[in-house]
């Protein structure tokens, strides 16, 4: 089966065989072989050869290809949404919003490129100072499985817009979405070699990251892999590395007037996408006392009624599955470990069907757990921590190596100002779900959540480097020479 796209040709992978399955039915929906190191090298060479001509195209010419890609996405929106839903397990309504985000990324990237890069000039003495930008060359994009269309798209689109050529290595759990996305680029008229698809798992990723022919790498995924890449690229200032990783995100709740609004926002923060967004709330900080008890009782009651089902189930569920049976097992094991260490199950997460990666929402009170693991449990498992006062809540919120997202539900603007000032996170929300962020806003975190902001508004900064010039059309001897220099 032809699973790789290199130099404008679909080719069969020669590496390890792997499959993609529907996480609920376990039906195989894609099969193929990954790219070997030799095939990775071929793709790098193809990208290197295609780069000069693509970079020399005018910005408007490149924009026209991107706009054709957006048109292709729109024409295949239903097909792509179904593909995303089938391969990830997320409900169709949510998969459709991902396709919309992919389309919207085109206009956002063009606007950001014009604002952040482009060309600027001004007089400087008898010359003109000019600032222009040039693409890096060949960049690799490593995509995640939770948003297999939208998140790699957030790197690929601005990279191509800036004039780079791209090597796309998607998650081995979502190869079908990647294949369909590349087909849309082909329909858009992207020249051969400008975008190359390298399917595969760990060995393919290692070969691509280690290839000396790449000029940079944009990664979205786990902190473990991201940390490995950071170590691998240490001492290589000639290569750009941008990492978007996970978080152990806190959502702090104060006593608010609208209890149900708080409950709904918590559910949207913790259980959207079956908890498989890097910005999902992992830790819910609730005040001690009667009001906090009432909030938790209401949260548990509502969460217990959340619809969980297959991606195409009708009426549509709120939550689909997690990505795989392996992921489901790991989450169930994590819950058991927390319970063994003293957590109290307010609402136990369950796996209704042993051979389906469907999990129901789980809520554990971990206040009594002496040493809570600082890790991202990537699924619908929310940990509750009771706090005594607001300073205690902020200290607990910051008690993590991560720093991606943090949120506050409060009726007090003064409290929010304090929270915003003292929180250590790249995204800080007030009375909005933790997973909410403007598509055009810089996205990323601090600490173990990553470095840089190589998507959305700041993407252009990482896809092109600035070149400062001092220019004048004529070479003229200055009227006054530097002391000590004589031309007579």
From Swiss-Prot:
Its EC number is 1.2.1.71. Pathway: Amino-acid degradation; L-arginine degradation via AST pathway; L-glutamate and succinate from L-arginine: step 4/5. CDD domains: ALDH_SGSD_AstD (cd07095). Coiled coil: none annotated. GO terms for molecular function: succinylglutamate-semialdehyde dehydrogenase activity. Pfam families: Aldedh. PROSITE patterns: ALDEHYDE_DEHYDR_CYS (PS00070), ALDEHYDE_DEHYDR_GLU (PS00687). Keywords: Arginine metabolism, NAD, Oxidoreductase. NCBIfam families: arg_catab_astD, PRK09457.1. Catalyzes the NAD-dependent reduction of succinylglutamate semialdehyde into succinylglutamate. Belongs to the aldehyde dehydrogenase family. AstD subfamily. This is N-succinylglutamate 5-semialdehyde dehydrogenase. The lineage of its organism: Bacteria, Pseudomonadati, Pseudomonadota, Gammaproteobacteria, Pseudomonadales.
């Amino acid at each position: 089966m032809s699973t790789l796209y290199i130099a404008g040709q679909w080719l069969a992978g020669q590496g390890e065989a792997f499959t993609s399955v529907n996480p609920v039915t376990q039906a195989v929906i894609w099969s193929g072989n990954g790219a070997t190191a030799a095939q990775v090298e071929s793709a790098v060479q193809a990208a290197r050869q295609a780069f000069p001509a693509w970079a020399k195209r005018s910005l408007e010419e490149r924009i026209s290809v991107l706009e054709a890609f957006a048109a292709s996405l729109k024409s295949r929106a239903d097909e792509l949404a179904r593909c995303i839903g089938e391969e990830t397990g997320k409900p169709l309504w949510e998969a459709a919003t991902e396709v919309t985000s992919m389309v919207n990324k085109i206009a956002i990237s063009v606007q950001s490129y014009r604002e952040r890069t482009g060309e600027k000039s001004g007089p400087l003495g008898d010359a003109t100072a000019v600032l222009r930008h040039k693409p890096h060359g060949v960049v690799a994009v490593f995509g995640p499985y939770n948003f297999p269309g939208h998140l790699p798209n957030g790197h690929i689109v601005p990279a191509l817009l800036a004039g780079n050529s791209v090597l796309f290595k998607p998650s081995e759990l979502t190869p079908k979405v990647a294949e369909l996305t590349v087909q849309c680029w082909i329909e858009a008229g992207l020249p051969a070699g400008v975008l190359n698809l390298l399917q595969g798992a760990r060995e393919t990723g290692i070969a691509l990251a280690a290839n000396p022919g790449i000029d940079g790498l944009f990664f979205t995924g786990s902190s473990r892999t991201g940390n490995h890449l950071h170590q691998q690229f240490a001492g290589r200032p000639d290569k750009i590395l941008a990492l978007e990783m996970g978080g152990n995100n806190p959502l702090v709740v104060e006593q608010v007037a609208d209890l149900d609004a708080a409950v709904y926002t918590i559910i949207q923060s913790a259980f959207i996408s079956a908890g498989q967004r890097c910005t999902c709330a992992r830790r819910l900080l609730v005040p001690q006392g009667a009001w906090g008890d009432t909030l938790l009782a209401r949260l548990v009651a509502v969460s217990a009624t959340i619809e969980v089902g297959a991606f195409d189930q009708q009426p549509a569920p709120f939550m689909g599955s997690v990505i795989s049976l392996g992921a489901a097992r790991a989450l169930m094991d994590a819950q058991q470990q927390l319970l063994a260490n003293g957590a109290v199950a307010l609402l136990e997460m369950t796996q209704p069907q042993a051979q389906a990666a469907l999990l129901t929402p789980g809520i554990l009170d971990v206040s009594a757990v002496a040493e809570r693991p600082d890790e991202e449990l990537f699924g619908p498992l929310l940990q509750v921590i009771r706090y005594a006062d607001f300073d205690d809540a902020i200290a607990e919120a910051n008690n993590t190596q991560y720093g991606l997202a943090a949120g506050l539900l409060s009726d007090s603007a003064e409290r929010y100002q304090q929270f915003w000032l003292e929180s250590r996170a790249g995204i800080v929300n007030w009375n909005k779900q933790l997973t909410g962020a403007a598509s055009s806003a810089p996205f990323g975190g601090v600490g173990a959540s990553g470095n840089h902001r190589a998507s959305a508004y700041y993407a252009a900064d990482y896809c092109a480097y600035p070149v400062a010039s001092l220019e004048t059309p004529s070479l003229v001897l200055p009227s006054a020479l530097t002391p000590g220099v004589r031309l007579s």
